[in-house]
Amino acid sequence: IDAFQDTLYTHTLRTYLGRPWK
């Protein structure tokens, strides 16, 4: 679940900023 949460958070940031966060 921790990994899923991290991915979801990163995906949200990427969508919000409109840039790839990696």
Curated annotation (Swiss-Prot):
GO terms for cellular component: extracellular region. One of its GO terms (biological process) is cell wall organization. It comes from the Eukaryota. The active site is at 6 (proton donor). One of its GO terms (molecular function) is pectinesterase activity. Pathway: Glycan metabolism; pectin degradation; 2-dehydro-3-deoxy-D-gluconate from pectin: step 1/5. It catalyses: [(1->4)-alpha-D-galacturonosyl methyl ester](n) + n H2O = [(1->4)-alpha-D-galacturonosyl](n) + n methanol + n H(+). Keywords: Aspartyl esterase, Cell wall, Cell wall biogenesis/degradation, Hydrolase, Secreted. It is found in: Secreted, Cell wall. Its EC number is 3.1.1.11. The record marks 5 as: Transition state stabilizer. This is Pectinesterase. It comes from Capsicum chinense (Scotch bonnet).
